[in-house]
Amino acid sequence: MSQTQPFLARVANGSLVIQIIVGIVAGILLASVAPESAISVGFLGGLFVSALKAVAPILVFILVASSIANQKKGAHTNMKPIIMLYLFGTLMAALTAVVMSFLFPTTLTLVAGNATASPPEGIAEVLNTLLFKIVDNPVNALMSGNFIGILAWAIALGFALHQASDATKQVFHDMSNGVTSIVRFVIRLAPIGIFGLVANTFAETGFAALAGYAHLLAVLLGSMAVIALVVNPAIVFFKTKENPYPLVFRCIRESGITAFFTRSSAANIPVNMQLCKDLDLHEDTYSVSIPLGATINMAGAAITITVLTLAAVHTMGVEVDIATAVLLSVVAAVSACGASGVAGGSLLLIPLACSLFGIPNEVAMQVVAVGFIIGVIQDSAETALNSSTDVLFTAAACKAAEAKVASPNIA
């Protein structure tokens, strides 16, 4: 027994990233050697993702309400620069995707799509959906994982509790610590969950179905890599005036890898919250910016919408001028910010973007079907970029604010 405890302690306190890498390798090996067994352990991945999704809504609600209720007068949360970074980053992602699509034009072999969900008819419908999510029933928002609604109610409750007694505020603070402890335990299970996810994915698809769309995937993943490794670091450097890459690589390593395999920005919120805490960021800031980022910071979605739309344009032989391409970037960026309010996410916003070029809805839905075929990779990479950027921009804004306070005379 005395030997077992140190071993378990070493596992519990060991490097989570190394354990996740071991889980990935083990999952690939199991899928290669025994596909049936790999499929059977897929439930481990499902359990892990479900646990993250279950704890995320209550974590956001309690943490936001507690941080706002306990916020001291005159405290700054840096939310304005973070939101500006989110929006600017999403627009830059769409513009980068346009450039990549023109440099490496893609044509598609369209397939008959069986996507039964209805795409939105316009940006107004997307924005309308988001507005109604804000005034959702709080219980329903928690049950359905509607983070816009959860944020709205948590912020309102936090402000309402500003005048509450210290004892009441302490209760929320203690609840926040309790939920955070539960989240920390769930995150330690990531290696087991990712092992199940990887094993199941490799055993079921083998990625053979993706071979016919190698060029499209190369443009998609190339655009995301440019954003993650060139554009985002440039934005962070401009904001912080220091080497951005240590922070960039840490966000990719500790947030992006988990998000890649869970394929859910909502499920990755607890992971991002923990990373922000490890980075010693201000809780009043990240408790709001991280769930907000999971809703509106959608660089990956903007890339997906733009690349697949321009692939449809090239396939149909439609001529595109620079002005229309820029307009597409804006539409893709605005649509991407509303992607969380659409069933099917970024893929079902493709018909909306295709309508700019007069492409029939039937053809656009075939492009959506292609998106579902490559979704194993596309959705994973998109989520990894979206989620890791939430932490990156939050940290950049916090560091810039700290530097400004430390050197008030420097512009």
Swiss-Prot record:
InterPro entries: Na-dicarboxylate_symporter, Na:dicarbo_symporter_sf, Ser_Thr_transp_SstT. Keywords: Amino-acid transport, Cell inner membrane, Cell membrane, Membrane, Symport, Transmembrane, Transmembrane helix, Transport. It is a multi-pass membrane protein. It comes from the Bacteria. The chain crosses the membrane at residues 14-34, 43-63, 82-102, 141-161, 192-212, 218-238, 290-310, 330-350, 357-377. GO terms for biological process: serine transport; threonine transport. It catalyses: L-serine(in) + Na(+)(in) = L-serine(out) + Na(+)(out); L-threonine(in) + Na(+)(in) = L-threonine(out) + Na(+)(out). GO terms for cellular component: plasma membrane. It is found in: Cell inner membrane. One of its GO terms (molecular function) is neutral L-amino acid:sodium symporter activity. PANTHER family: PROTON/GLUTAMATE-ASPARTATE SYMPORTER, SERINE_THREONINE TRANSPORTER SSTT. Involved in the import of serine and threonine into the cell, with the concomitant import of sodium (symport system). HAMAP family: Ser_Thr_transp_SstT. Belongs to the dicarboxylate/amino acid:cation symporter (DAACS) (TC 2.A.23) family. This is Serine/threonine transporter SstT. It comes from Photobacterium profundum (strain SS9). The gene is sstT.
